[in-house]
Amino acid sequence: MSRIVYLDNNATTQMAPEVIEAVAQVESSVFGNASSMHTFGRRAGALVEDARLKVAQLLECETSEITFTSGASEANNTIFMIAKSLIEKRGSGRIVTSAVEHPSIIETVKYLKSIGIHVDLAPVGKDGRVIMSELEKLMGPDVVLTSIMTGNNETGAIMDIATISQMAHKCGSLMHTDATQAIGKIKVSCKEWNLDYLSCSGHKFYGPKGVGVLVAKKGVPFMPFVHGGEQEHGRRAGTYNTAAIYGLGIAAKLAMDGLEQENKMLWAMRERLREGIVKAIPNVVVNGSQEHCLTGTLDVSF
């Protein structure tokens, strides 16, 4: 009987056992609406805030800067719609992003272009990383938002977000990174990178599907994408998915505690796979940067 090996963790990871246990426990025993003021609601609300603290520690930001969403796609759309609103209010402005972003950004860019918003795409080199000299040429005082992913989901290329953030702020632009693929593989720091916005999804680091995070630095522009109730201080309406959010918090704690060990294991497995493929298949090309690469990603062509 043949053995099936799962090699699609950049699409989604299996929930960690600790996360599965936590989600199941909350689903079976904590059913109150986290926005309600009664005992059942406060109990659910406490779990949401526990998760918020863990996520803030993982991303090195303030708890007040975190907005829970349905995932990175929603967070990315929210951030780009904020930029759209700013450009429309000013009557001018541009967005700068890269040509290799996740579809939730690329497709949003297509929409924005269709309604007249100016968006420039920075190219990447053979190593899959944004060409910094080309990005710098695109920067200027009219750039409202610069958005570059932390790590690419196909090549694994890691971008120099700290330097790009400096470049963006130098010309007065807001800075966003989609860190979805990087969480749990490299240290991600909103404070060290001086980010205005960050987005990520729980299911890419052993957390539940359908839950994500939007970090918005205190004082930066924010316009809700989902309107309705006053959840998340009016930033994102909708009844809290308490179990998924709590599970996200558990996954965040696991990512913090196991970062070094996880990376060693992933890199060893990646190298074993790479060596096996190169040995078995002639003329294989390993794509992307091998120096600046997410440990769990291998991209080859033959």
Residue ranges with predicted function:
Residues 1-302:
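Pyridoxal 5′-phosphate
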